[in-house]
């Protein structure tokens, strides 16, 4: 397992859940945390602990977004009309790295961030190298022509472990993805239960 994979799966081990639904996740082989004390039964979490865990899990899922960036997204979510938890998910799904991952241009959220940072992605015909770029409804995201034959891109396109959600329209031949609509929590294909309402409670303390 590579160092990057080890770092990625550390989130799974810490949460005790296979948060991306990956076949190679170490939690598929055990149901306890890492380390020599991993098999000890954990005590019941306080309300604060449950809320904190929900936040850590969602942050981890989106490639371990920094606390500063995640809180900024949360603040924006509270300023939008409607349910703040739903708004939070909608904003996270509008991130360019999330769209690239959902479209199956790469195999992981972490790879999506690196792929964008290295200049392999265009939005509406213009190169964008900022992973947190906010995609709008109707935007066309595409893999740069010279990057379409990269081995890891071709392999990701064939992954059977996840499907493209219906709020993104993908042309696998052209490697383009059109962002159709902002999704609700129920539209997002999370491998484990996410509870954004607990995150709203956490920040509202």
Swiss-Prot record:
Keyword set, alphabetical order: Ribonucleoprotein, Ribosomal protein, RNA-binding, rRNA-binding
Residues spanning the signal sequence: none
Pfam families linked to this entry: Ribosomal_S4, S4
Transmembrane regions listed in the UniProt entry: none
Domain S4 RNA-binding: 94-157
Any one Gene Ontology cellular component term annotated for this protein: small ribosomal subunit
GO BP terms in the entry: ribosomal small subunit biogenesis; translation
Region (Disordered): 18-46
One annotated GO molecular function: structural constituent of ribosome
Superkingdom of the source species: Bacteria
Its job: One of the primary rRNA binding proteins, it binds directly to 16S rRNA where it nucleates assembly of the body of the 30S subunit. With S5 and S12 plays an important role in translational accuracy.
Quaternary structure note: Part of the 30S ribosomal subunit. Contacts protein S5. The interaction surface between S4 and S5 is involved in control of translational fidelity.
Family in the record: Belongs to the universal ribosomal protein uS4 family.
Protein name: Small ribosomal subunit protein uS4
Lineage start: Bacteria, Pseudomonadati, Pseudomonadota, Alphaproteobacteria, Hyphomicrobiales
GN (gene name): rpsD
